[in-house]
Each structure stands twice: as C-alpha cells, then as structure tokens.
Amino acid sequence: TSLEEVVVGGYGVQKKRDIVGAVEQITSKDIENRIGSYQNAARSLQGSIPGMTVTFSDGKPTRGATVRIRGENTIGAGGSALVLVDGVETDISTVNSEDIESYTVLKDASSTAVYGSRGTFGVILITTKKPDKGQMKITYNGSYNFYQRSVTPEIVDNGLDWTNSFLESYINGRATDPANINNVFKFSRTWYDELNRRNADPSYEKWRVNPSNGRYEYFGNTNWYDIFYKDYTTGHQHNISVTGGGDVASYYVSGRMFEQDGIYNAGDEKYQQFNVKAKGIVNVKPWLRVENTTDFMYRYSHQPTSHTGISTTPMTVSRMLNHQAYPVALVTNPDGTWTEAAVYTGWAGFVEGNSWRKDRKFDMNNRTAVTIDLLKDVLVAAADVSFYFNQTDRRQAVNSYTYYTGPDSSGERPSGSLYEERSYNRQ
C-alpha cells in the first residue's frame, strides 16, 4: 500500500505511515514525460503537487525558477523553497533531470524543523539515481525540439491606422496637436497630410526628403516584431548514462548536452548547458559503506543586447520596441544606411553583432558519505562531507552605431564600451 512506501525526509528514510508532517513524493516515472523538464528540472514540478507553484519570469533557458510550496497567497509566500540534491543545497536549474530518481516535498514546520530557518518556506529533497548492480547498462535518449512564443501581441503595422489612434488619444488628453511622437519622431500636420496621401496611393515611396530641412521623413507600415522575432526556434538535447557493478562496488556515470537557439532573427543568440555526474558506492565491509558523488555543470549563453546609450546596462527588447518601434518608421534609408529608429531599438546592434553579453557559469559539487550499520536494520550512523565551487563570468560590449536623418546629416548612439566581471563562490 501507499503507507508502506519509503519516503526521504529531513531525518532520513522513513515509511510514509510513520511520518506526521505534510510530505509529498514524486518519482521519476511521474515526471518522465513532462514537457520542458529537459530544459530545466524545475519545470517537471509544475502542476505536480497541489498548492505548490513553480514560476519563471520569462522563457529564457537561463532563467531560474521560483518555487513556492504553500502557494502564492499565503503569509510569507515571498520566500522560495530550499532545494537539496542528495543532501547538498543546490540551484535546481543546474540539475540534469535525467539523473533524478525522486522529489520529496516537505511542506510544514514539523517536517522541515531539522533545517531551521532555511526551511521556513518548505524544503525540496531531490534524490538522484543510484548505481544498478549487474552487467554494464548503457542508456541514451535525445530529442530535437521546436519552441514558439506562448504569447504574441497583436501588432498594428499600418502606419496610418497607428497614427490616427495615437493622434486621437493625444488630442483627447491635451486638446492640441503633438509636436513629437517621441524624442526621435517629429509630428506635423504637413507630415500627417503626406502620410494620408501616400497611404491612399501605394505607388508612392514610403520616405521622402523634406525640402525645407533636408531631413528624411517616413511613411512606413513596419511590423517591428516580425523584424526582431522568429516564428519559432529550435533546440536539441542528448543524455547518456552508464551503470553497473557488483556486490562490492557499483557505479553510475551520466552526461548531458542541451543547446537552444535564440528567438531573435539576428544576433547569434545561443544557450548551451553540459552536465556530468559520477556516483560510486563501495561496500568496504558488510557493515561499512562509502559513497561518493561528483557533479559538474557548465553553462554558456550569448545574447545580443539593446542599450540605454549612456551605460552598459542592457534594456529589454520589449521596452525599446514600445519606445521607438513605430510602424511609420523604417529600418533603413533608401541608400541602405540605418534610420534613427533602427539604432534606438537596438536592431542595428543585433544585425552588426558587436553589442552583446556573454555569460559563463561553472559549478562543481562533490559529496562523500560514510554509512555504518551499528545494529543491522535498527541503528545506523552516517556522516558526510561536501564541497561546492561556483564561478561565473560575464563579458559585455556596447558599441556605437551611426544613423542618418538625412542624406547629409548623421548621428551616433551610444558611446562604445566593454566591461568584464567575475565572481567565485566556494563552500
């Protein structure tokens, strides 16, 4: 029966019938077909336990999860659960989901008491697969995946329709015509009348040089979201594991490679993650067992960046699109030079490829455990020691791009810069 099931808890392994606190357990079979679990182990927990929420701020594979065991609306819900992998505190996003044997979720104070204040918001215990005794067994699985934006905004890409909506809203609020659409795009009734004329006759060009000031004027129908974003992107992942051994010694070794391309049409965005795990168990004596587990994780991401123009802090693409990507604006001038809108949105930097951010992360985790059976099946003594090393590197470049506001007038944004930062963490 389910009451006879063995559950991993804060005080060791117990039968479910002997546990007083609120505990839930999920096995690898329960989650093996979960969509996205190969991308991030936390995704396999979504919707698996009543009351527990697993959220991501966006769909980037680099994004870590916020796991709230007691739901979003309870007191103290602002804290995320403590995650332990084989007894060692770990970022769940670094774990290879193929190595996971089971999840145990400790919900209430009685079951998390052993963890003190760190377990205030609940504890998730992840147990990884153990070696299988017997002849060597090699397992491989892989997949090729397609990804698509889950939410795509409805875009008004007709320049005249967009301008009419903007003009109506502005006049209703201020009872006067605007002087500018924004800090880049000027507005005048002369330009608006020309927009109506060119929209009525498609044979006209979507640009002209204003004879009074020599500047370009634009009358486009540009869908900037189609310019920036692909309809879908792809990724692939490969897992291999080797296990075997006898009564004295057994082993489990696994490796994983996951790669996903970016969603942008330019900029060479890419994400890669590699995992290696080695676990060995040696029965030195019938009553003495030594176990060692070593994990390596390497993560690399390259992404094009937008910019503020005055610092190296990236702006999100969506914010720059909201500020600068109006359908009346064009991407390039008739001579192929960048428009001001193309530079301000960040598209020029995406295409030229020299404004970017590269992140690298390396984790190494080693745990050695010794178990002594003092009285078989009655009294057990156990001790373990662990070592954790983490290194992160970030390099970022923001370079200048020239735009032309007329055949003989140009500007530049922003000033070029390059910086690097590095951090280490040893425990």
Q: Each predicted region: which residue ranges?
A:
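Short glycine-/small-residue-rich flexible loop motifs, especially phosphate/cofactor-binding loops
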Residues: 42-44, 87, 329, 338, ...
